[in-house]
């Protein structure tokens, strides 16, 4: 109401707004509204990085071949599995590694020997980055130079 009264006084004196100025103000208001709507749309498409499922790593110490199926089930459920074969005998360990290697290959996964009798098996959604393979290869190549 006060603004309307002020506009009337300015109009009476001869300083009233022209129609162009009114149109410019309306246009600016519309542009601000459109910009806010575009920002809201962009924000609606943002996905939080932390909203995904947590990655789980399962550590297993199988003593017999009977436990190999549980390890394969973990891989099937897209979990990384670290297998420590120190409790298994040599023949059992070989059978377990063969079985889990086959399951890993069927699931397009990957495997890596981590240490003596310790293996890492991962499904296809996990990549293994390994710098130790190169170091191990270099150590074996230059083993003669150390003595």
Curated annotation (Swiss-Prot):
* Xref: Pfam families: SepF
- Where does this polypeptide localize? Cytoplasm
The UniProt transmembrane annotation reads none
For the keyword Cell cycle, the answer is yes
| One cellular-component annotation, GO | cytoplasm
Q: Which UniProt keywords apply?
A: Cell cycle, Cell division, Cytoplasm, Septation
The Gene Ontology biological process annotation of the record reads: division septum assembly; FtsZ-dependent cytokinesis
Query: Partners and quaternary state?
Result: Homodimer. Interacts with FtsZ.
HAMAP family referenced in this protein's UniProt entry, alphabetically:
SepF
Primary role:
Cell division protein that is part of the divisome complex and is recruited early to the Z-ring. Probably stimulates Z-ring formation, perhaps through the cross-linking of FtsZ protofilaments. Its function overlaps with FtsA.
What family does this belong to? Belongs to the SepF family.
**By what name is this protein known?**
Cell division protein SepF 1
Species name: Desulforamulus reducens (strain ATCC BAA-1160 / DSM 100696 / MI-1)
Q: Which gene encodes it?
A: sepF1
